[in-house]
Amino acid sequence: EETYKVYPFHFHLEIGYRLEDASVSVMWKVKNINDKEMHFAIGAHPAFFCPLHEGEKQSEYCLGFRNGQGKVPEALVNTVFGEGGVVTTQKKEYKLTDGCLPMDEHLFDGDALVIEDHQIQKVVLMDPQKKEYLAVEFDAPLVVIWSPPKKQAPFVCIEPWYGRCDSEIFDGELKDRDWENTLAAGEEFEASYRIIVE
């Protein structure tokens, strides 16, 4: 009932986990239990240890990317975060070298990388020798990657999102937000992502 005060929809959410070899799949099921349309967004918030070993720095590590065809993109376009947790209309392009984006000391200075439009379906963490040690696979239209700037935090988050926070120029209803999802009465939404330890 507390949720209903700020989000005027009744829903049923199921989250499941499946372990298989060196991977874990996370499954979501959202059911609209209203007698009207429901608008929603859902996303994951997994964080991964980085750097792996004592004496290493996160800035020595690299992010690798694959698109939906398993190919390595030449560049990524990031939607830039602004003040107050909203995205701006600004875009920033990152050129990749062999599909790799170094996690230098300034990569997250502007907050998170927000990669939209199904540009990628897999993010890989690579150690200083460019050895892949962890991957996140997903079908989500967006992925958000971040680590606290200027804090040398020992983790990086790789978050598949079905939906996104508001844009700084957004002025409308929930149903009109970019990347918002809609379910008719009684309908269900299902999605998943997979974490693979290499």
Residues of each region from the PLM?
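Hydrophobic core residues within well-ordered beta-strands of beta-rich domains
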Residues: L13, V24-V26, F189
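Asparagine-centered strand-capping/turn motif at beta-strand->loop junctions
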Residues: W28-N34
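Active-site/ligand-binding surface loops and adjacent short beta/alpha elements
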Residues: E37-H39, A47-F138
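Short, structured beta-strand/loop micro-motifs enriched in basic residues and often containing a Trp
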Residues: E168-D176
